[in-house]
Amino acid sequence: MNLSATILLAFGMSMDAFAASIGKGATLHKPKFSEAVRTGLIFGAIETLTPLVGWGLGMLASQFILEWNHWIAFILLVFLGGRMIVEGFRGDSDEACEAPHRHGFWLLVTTAFATSLDAMAVGVGLAFLQVSIVTTALAIGCATFIMSTLGMMVGRFIGPLLGKRAEILGGIVLIGIGSEILWSHFAG
């Protein structure tokens, strides 16, 4: 795979993480740049590892992985998105209830993992091609770091405009991503 194809693949794989990080940024109370970088690092690290795992699994059992990855991503994203929607509607009527200043580590890891399962499937496919899996995985991770960090900062500006509805919107985005993954599997 040539350099331009690798870069296009990397940024294509980062789009789900970008959308999810916009939703995450919108639900925080004025996230700082350091929080955006933290989120980018978590998403980027996981997005780097999943194609490597997929590549390894592709060498072993590609058919099983390809049959189930879309369902796993869909269930995780619908669960996380549903939780965000419920929290958005549950909020206190007085505005004294302030948005969090940062998301928990495991919530970010779970979201990052759910949005990176397509990269794992790509890794399975790459197992059958003559590519440098390490270079490709690093490119995907770097692109995801950049896009997730930018997504958090974009979400920072959207969040104050939406208020408590930002959490509902973030949940809808996650459910939409999960649905798109499932739809792509059955339509494609």
From Swiss-Prot:
It is a multi-pass membrane protein. Pfam families: Mntp. The chain crosses the membrane at residues 3-23, 41-61, 62-82, 107-129, 143-163, 168-188. It is found in: Cell inner membrane. InterPro entries: Mntp/YtaF, Put_MntP. GO terms for cellular component: plasma membrane. Keywords: Cell inner membrane, Cell membrane, Ion transport, Manganese, Membrane, Transmembrane, Transmembrane helix, Transport. The keyword Cell inner membrane applies. One of its GO terms (molecular function) is manganese ion transmembrane transporter activity. Coiled coil: none annotated. Its main location: membrane. Belongs to the MntP (TC 9.B.29) family. Probably functions as a manganese efflux pump. This is Putative manganese efflux pump MntP. The lineage of its organism: Bacteria, Pseudomonadati, Pseudomonadota, Gammaproteobacteria, Enterobacterales.
